[in-house]
Amino acid sequence: MFSYLPRYPLRAASARALVRATRPSYRSALLRYQSSEAVGRTQEIVPGAYQIPPRDFSRQHEEKLAPKNAARAPRRIEPATLKLNSKNLSQLQNVTVPTYQREGVKQGIVHVGVGGFHRAHLAAYVDTLLEQFNSQDWSICGVDLQPFAAPMRDALGSQDNLYTMIECDTEGTSARVIGSITDYLFAPDNCEAVIAKMAHPDTHIVSMTVTESGYYMNENTHELQIDHPDIAADLAGQQPPRTVFAYLYAALARRHAAGLRPFTVMSCDNMQKNGDISRNMLLAFARQQNPEVADWIAENGAFPNSMVDRITPRTSDENKAQLAQEFGVEDSWPVVTEVFHQWVLEDKFADGRPPFEKAGVQVVPNVHKVEEYELIKLRLLNASHSAMGYAGYLGGFTYIHEVIADPTFRKYIRNMMQEEVQPLLPRIPGVSVDDYCNTLLGRFSNPTLKDELPRICLGGSGKIPQFIMPSIAEQIQAGGPLRRLTLCAAAWFRYLRGINEQGQAFKLDDPMAEELQAKALESPFSVLEVKSLFGDDLRDDKRFVAELKNALESLERDGARATIAQYA
């Protein structure tokens, strides 16, 4: 269920977790609360349950867990700053650190794409399993495939693969060292080592966060882009491999030849039916290479679908300085995130899995349960992010919390969610979508995250067709309202020109940037001609075309802020 509680098990030594759990702002308004009696000094948060923290804390613990408040005694000692590494771990006084022995833990998970979201999400859940439940077979070997990830290789390598997770909310900040990544491989340095690691019998899951563009799926046909230069190069056997599917196929082919079971391919990307997409793209790639191996994967493999949620901004120099000053930790690349986090995961695995549910993951029996949650999240949270991102950037804002603080933008987002998206969503027993929308507005308003709009705006070619256009298509079919949704698409089309309202150029961060910018500079309306994203149906609908033209004309004539006010 949707929950606003920290989903890690609560312990007396977990700084601020218990305080946050009892704050009214983080109590789930979506669920029927179930009482649960704490056992000893450990209390697990069960999905769908609200639990009262243990009360047998000493005064000392109560003072440590108190929220940041200038009127209270200082909440921590100010130590000398220490470089984060295994040697210094025991000397860090103001952060939660791993107490498990990292050296003897097996790497049952290989994760491709060690970015901020992975480090704040899957790696944090696994860290909880290692810390609280002695899951000794399930640490992570991180993998990056692209040369641009070299700074991550260097940062983790200098810190024994440790990093700090900074959790920010409106009432304070806490920090926790994550130790679940116990090995790291950089494919440009040694692609063979990556394939060998995936093929190793100890590897049971290969998970990935490679973004929408990393799946090479035609958004119109939902088929693998066989003619894409990267896919074509991998199918031709060029070295080093360019795509995740070349690595997955090579490793699975070795396991097939060795008589091993296939590993589970677990997508953690923010896409609807991410498991099904992973399966279809990999099988299409494998059939081009060896139909026998493809059939073996299809029959024996597993590709669980999931819904993932945690806002994770880019790490700034300011975040690093804050970590050093307030917590005494020198970390080359900490990850910054919110307190809220959620993961709904289909229970479909080929070769075993860790007890994810013990760490707060909502493990569900079939894909239909996942689809209900992910549809709500993608159509509300991600669509709203896009609506704020493109129009907000054009309007001169810098951060998401600034956009949502603007009364006209806030009204526009709320009305778009309630009037144009909510009527299209499934009804889930025990879940109030109205309350979920209200909670989203609160999450967007968090000023401590400083979530920059350029992060929200990157990769729009993989976002708008997934988050916005399906709702527009359904409203067209139903004859329902679509003005605000169409304005979101129009703002993206206008954004693709790469020129802001002050006439200043900016760089587009999108895998289709060259093609899309050329269309937008010709005329923003021409972006609709890109069939791989939009097909033909939308261009043929007179009502949508009229709404799109009106929105584009208003953006051009009046600017983003005035247009939002008209549409709110």
Swiss-Prot record:
Record GO terms (molecular function): mannitol 2-dehydrogenase activity; mannitol dehydrogenase activity
Residue numbers binding NAD(+): I109, V110, H111, V112, G113, V114, G115, G116, F117, H118, R119, A120
EC number: 1.1.1.67
Record field: catalytic activity: D-mannitol + NAD(+) = D-fructose + NADH + H(+)
Keywords of this entry: NAD, Oxidoreductase
Function text: Catalyzes the NAD(H)-dependent interconversion of D-fructose and D-mannitol in the mannitol metabolic pathway.
Complexes and interactors: Monomer.
The family this protein is said to belong to: Belongs to the mannitol dehydrogenase family.
Protein name: Mannitol 2-dehydrogenase
